[in-house]
Amino acid sequence: MGNSANEDKLRYACDRCHSQKLRCPRSVEPEKANPEEPCSRCRKAGVPCVVSLRGKVGRPSKATKKKSARSPRATSTPEAEFPPYDINSVLSGEVDGSIPWASPSGDRMMDMFDLASGSGSVTTSASPKTMAEDYQPEGQRPFPDPLMGPGLIQVPYEPFLMEFDTDADYPTFCIPPSLTDMPAGVEFNQPQDKTFNSSQMDSFMDVKTDASMMMPHADMDMTSPKGTGPTIDPVTVDPRMSFSAHAAQSPGDIFASDDFEAGAEFSSTASYQKLSDLNLRILQCGSTAQAGTAPQNSSQLLKDVVGFSGELIDIARQSMPHFVGCTRSSSRASTTSKGSSMESDEGDGSIDTAFSQSSWGSLKPGSASGPQATSQSVPESAVIFLLLGCYTQILHLFELTTNCLWAQHCEAGQPAPQNDDTSGTIGSLLEASIAIHTVTYLLSRLHRALAAPEMDASTDAADSHGWKKSFVGGKELEDGLLGRAFGEIREREQWLMRRTKHLQQRINKCHI
């Protein structure tokens, strides 16, 4: 019994054959082989044939080694429980419900079950592979995890965050690029390299439309004193019209202030050419407006009138101080000397009494530079009458504008209703109100431009006839061409102011 117990503990192969993994002759017929006799290989080699105890000498048994190595993987990721689905079949709805139990991983699990059952004998299989040769570590597997599936492996991986150009200059959106670059006292939402430019905002606010012309308010003083008058920005005039030399400046500069260069040289020839061109364009505009006086033409006509008035005001502010013989700065000082010269020339009945200190004195006989200075220039009287002619034609355009508004908002040929209120829209009433204020404002500015420099411009525009003293010398000329021309102009002004006042009252009664 004791020998049988010891023999059971011995290995069937000798140590030399076991280390070389050769089939030992002792294992062929272990019951016949004597443990004391050496095997044929050890006998030929002339070495002692040593047989060690089973499990005590050499490496541990295969079953124990494989069980310890496979147990963590078997508990963490059971590969045989989930079939490797194809991603294409999943998307198309054709999923195979069969589980491949005949996979290599399933065979390995069955072998582990047989070894763990403790049969005590090595089961021989037809496959030459052993469990140790079939097993490979997880990091060295040539095939991916079966859970991913073969179809999912072929799908390219596209990350959500694509590659960005980090060197590109992107806007900071009011966030400074580096907090260390910010000086002390600067808030976080204020970028250091950004500055506010008011001119950029002006380009967005300056919208030129028919109903959005920048005109003075209704309760604004139309004839405020010098330097404090309201300023407007006239709209763009018709592009088919040609402008004179002042067109290079912005149109708002014409109405901005009453200041001008006192030392600017006056040329009657240049002024006559400007007035002649302006007179021709006003005549063409009036002919076009009379051909079709439709209500929708009032906005375009008003644009043209604004441009014409600006040019006439510019020319008048350059020529009137030269005609009167004084500037804005010296107007008060020349009042007394002008009055004495007017009394001395009153008996002669000369028309030059109003211009005693002007350049008209150079035209008198005996003047040192009279004939030589005026031989190559246009007479200044022609410039004066052209000023009046252009002003009269602009009054005519004012009349056409108010007639268009009257035809649009009032009943033609019928008196204005006393109790019944008319109706209108916001756009039409706003356009009409802006047009009325534009006409009255331009009329007051023309009066101030044509008035003598020393006269006070604080009177009302409807009753302002003091500008005529620059042309008639303070005396009302009832006879003659000039007196009749002034009478006609006065009638036009009075009719225009009555019509605009009546039209404003009608618009105020309208309800939306």
UniProtKB/Swiss-Prot annotation:
PROSITE patterns: ZN2_CY6_FUNGAL_2. Pfam families: Zn_clus (PF00172). It is found in: Nucleus. One of its GO terms (cellular component) is nucleus. Residues 14-49 bind DNA. GO terms for biological process: nitrogen catabolite activation of transcription from RNA polymerase II promoter. Residues 56-70 have a biased composition (Basic residues). GO terms for molecular function: DNA binding; DNA-binding transcription factor activity, RNA polymerase II-specific; zinc ion binding. Residues 54-87, 118-148, 325-351 are annotated as: Disordered. The keyword Transcription regulation applies. Keywords: DNA-binding, Metal-binding, Nucleus, Transcription, Transcription regulation, Zinc. It comes from the Eukaryota. Residues 118-127, 327-342 have a biased composition (Low complexity). Ascofuranone is a specific inhibitor of trypanosome alternative oxidase (TAO), and quickly kills African trypanosomes in vitro and cures infected mice. As an essential factor for trypanosome survival, TAO is a promising drug target due to the absence of alternative oxidases in the mammalian host. Induction: Expression is induced on AF medium. PANTHER family: GLUCOSE TRANSPORT TRANSCRIPTION REGULATOR RGT1-RELATED-RELATED, TRANSCRIPTIONAL ACTIVATOR PROTEIN DAL81. Transcription factor that regulates the expression of the asc-1 and asc-2 gene clusters that mediate the biosynthesis of both ascochlorin and ascofuranone, a strong inhibitor of cyanide-insensitive alternative oxidases and a promising drug candidate against African trypanosomiasis. Binds the 5'-CGGYGNNTTW-3' motif within promoters of the target genes. This is Ascofuranone/ascochlorin biosynthesis clusters transcription regulator. It comes from Acremonium egyptiacum (Oospora egyptiaca). The lineage of its organism: Eukaryota, Fungi, Dikarya, Ascomycota, Pezizomycotina.
